[in-house]
UniProtKB/Swiss-Prot annotation:
Coiled coil: none annotated. The gene is dmrt1y. The lineage of its organism: Eukaryota, Metazoa, Chordata, Craniata, Vertebrata. Residues 16-63 bind DNA. This is Doublesex- and mab-3-related transcription factor 1Y. It comes from Oryzias latipes. Residues 98-121 are annotated as: Disordered. The keyword Transcription applies. The keyword Hydrolase does not apply.
Length: 267
């Protein structure tokens, strides 16, 4: 009996970890304030300090969780696995599969229960973390289809863009062969005071016919422009008809032997 009592180990007495790092065995009870290496900054003592901080944080977290459960702020729920969010990148929609909802089957629970418990305690420890997780899940939800229909560019914009719009370039009224920047005033364009036949020598019996007459020009303009544009150029056609009548009168007067009217001032 005495041998058995001697072989039995005594009660476990906690030892000082700092003293153990320095190859000493000192009981921890009443030794914390008198430890030689309580201010030591070696690598092993730094690891001990970090371990103590982590353990203290875990204890505080457990106390806070217990207080919240007593007050009824949050109730623990037994979840087989975390929520799964599946994103379909081909389409613009997201599929959420949660327990109790119809959707894609959830994967089997994590075989490591410690990691699941640690993640659950970290997520439910503070309400701010839960709110952050909810906001992230809400941001992944699909938007309405009208949003994509409104902001999505049309596929056939290049073909149907100018179908019912106005023409791209504004059509200018037909000119008399002059440049647009060197147009003459209207009082000089209405009457031709100097026809080409007035400067011919007297020996020629008949005037040289021009390359084209104003009547031919009017016919070519009428055939070139469609009928829908004739209403927009009524003033141009009226001017041409008047000028053709005036030129015909001047030609008849010149052929009868009269002198063409001169706009030069008489001395």
């Amino acid at each position: 009996m005495s041998k058995e009592k001697q072989c039995r180990p005594g009660p476990r007495v906690p030892k000082c970890s700092r003293c153990r790092n320095h190859s000493l065995k000192t009981p921890l009870k009443g030794h914390k304030r008198f430890c030689r290496w309580k201010d030591c900054h070696c690598l092993k003592c730094k690891l001990i300090v970090d371990r103590q901080r982590v353990m203290a944080a875990q204890v505080a977290l457990r106390r806070q969780q217990a207080q919240e459960e007593e007050l009824g702020i949050c109730s623990p729920e037994a979840s087989s696995g975390p929520e799964v969010v599946v994103k379909n990148e081909a389409g613009a929609d997201c599929l959420f599969s949660v327990e109790g909802r119809s959707g894609t089957p959830a994967p089997p629970p994590n075989p490591n229960p410690l990691s699941v418990a640690g993640s659950y305690s970290a997520s439910s420890s503070s309400p701010s973390a839960a709110a952050r997780v909810y906001s992230e899940e809400a941001s992944d939800q699909p938007l309405e289809t009208s949003y994509y229909n409104f902001y999505q560019p049309s596929r056939y914009s290049s073909y149907y863009g100018n179908l019912y719009n106005y023409q791209q370039y504004q059509q200018m009224p037909p000119s008399d062969g002059r440049l647009s920047g060197h147009s003459m005033p209207s009082q000089y364009r209405m009457h031709s005071f100097y026809p080409g036949t007035a400067y011919l020598p007297q020996g020629l019996g008949s005037p040289v016919p021009p390359y084209f007459s104003l009547e031919d020009n009017d016919g070519a303009a009428a055939s070139f422009f469609p009928s829908s544009l004739t209403s927009t150029h009524d003033s141009t056609l009226t001017y041409r008809s008047i000028s053709s009548l005036v030129n015909d009168g001047v030609k008849a007067e010149f052929e009868s032997g009269g002198q063409p009217p001169s706009s030069r001032p008489t001395p």
